[in-house]
A protein has these predicted regions:
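Short, charged, low-complexity loops and linkers
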Residues: 1-11, 32-44, 68-75, 98-111, ...
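A structural signal for well-ordered alpha-helices, especially hydrophobic packing surfaces
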Residues: 17, 21-31, 50, 57, ...
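Secondary-structure edge/capping motif, primarily at the C-terminal ends of alpha-helices
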Residues: 24-38, 60, 64-68, 94-105, ...
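Hydrophobic/aromatic-rich structural module bridging two neighboring secondary-structure elements via a short loop
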Residues: 40, 47, 59-90
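Conserved small/polar residues in nucleotide/adenosyl-binding loops
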Residues: 149-156
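Leu/Val/Ala/Ile-rich N-terminal alpha-helices, chiefly Sec-type signal peptides and the beginnings
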Residues: 1-52, 56-60, 64
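Intrinsic-disorder/low-complexity, polar/charged segments
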Residues: 6, 35, 79-82, 156
């Protein structure tokens, strides 16, 4: 009898977070060295990252549907995956809005905001890397979550 392949959901989460971080890095790079004439090519690069993230999310959802037992609640895994995908989608949306509104010059506040997004995604990467052994890494995950939440609050303040 063929042995059933084990699904590593925490690895899948980590891969999704890597896509969000790649998108944040690309956004930061584009805004730091802003060249409006390169926006179409940069949007295509960003869309490749976002599409890769969508594929990872869909793969995980397919596996969750078929899996009988998961390491944590199925709904929690689904919610994490959806939220991470939303982060990646929203990062892509920033670049799309810059293109749609024909932005010609980047304001310093936008650069600060892009750097905050990148730092937030770095925190998500650190958290995701520890999820595989969440019982052992409970404290580090907690600290990472607090740091991420603090950055999110700062982002909200910077945006308003």
């Amino acid at each position: 009898m063929a042995r059933k392949e084990k699904n590593d959901y925490f690895q899948m989460i980590e891969e999704q977070v890597a896509h969000a971080r790649d998108a944040a890095w690309l956004l930061n790079e584009i805004l730091t060295d802003f060249r409006p004439n390169e926006l179409p090519a940069n949007r295509a690069r960003m869309h490749e990252i976002e599409h890769g993230a969508d594929i990872k999310k869909h793969d995980m959802m397919e596996k969750l549907i078929r899996e009988f037992i998961t390491p944590i609640e199925r709904e929690d895994l689904r919610d994490m995956s959806e939220e991470i995908d939303t982060v990646t989608d929203l990062i892509e949306d920033v670049l799309n809005k810059i293109y749609i509104y024909n932005v010609a010059k980047m304001r310093p506040e936008a650069l600060e905001f892009a750097a905050l997004i990148l730092r937030s995604c770095d925190d998500l990467v650190a958290i995701a890397q520890r999820l595989g052994d969440f019982r052992k890494n409970r404290e580090e995950i907690g600290h990472g979550t607090v740091s991420y939440t603090h950055l999110r609050a700062h982002e909200t303040g910077a945006y308003l």
